[in-house]
């Protein structure tokens, strides 16, 4: 515990733990590709294995989320508003939650994808995973954005990445 009262005004940057969380959420979402490939192949043992891996990853993401919330500084001078960080954390959490839910529903119902739709479905899943990967890249750029004081070339880079994410 810092003894200097001025030190306690400034919070430790929460960006690192947020980056760990989105990385785990993306890892869970990326599991949708092998999951859908196994569904198309009707390899239900593999479908179940991938789904269980996704459940484990989502639970790890939830533990990271809880840790971020518990240790998010309540100090006066955070680099960004606490409410914005909590909102971002909530959005990140939905990435893993939705991926896990999709896998659970499809496995539970043993859903099959009609052959004429299989290629389009894989392309759709790939685009969804690409969007998750772009979100991961954006959050990973936050350190540099903070270091530059939200100015200069780094701001333009992050803005273009966010715009690309909006298009996906």
Language-model segments: residues:
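Cytosolic, long alpha-helical scaffolding segments
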Residues: 1-168
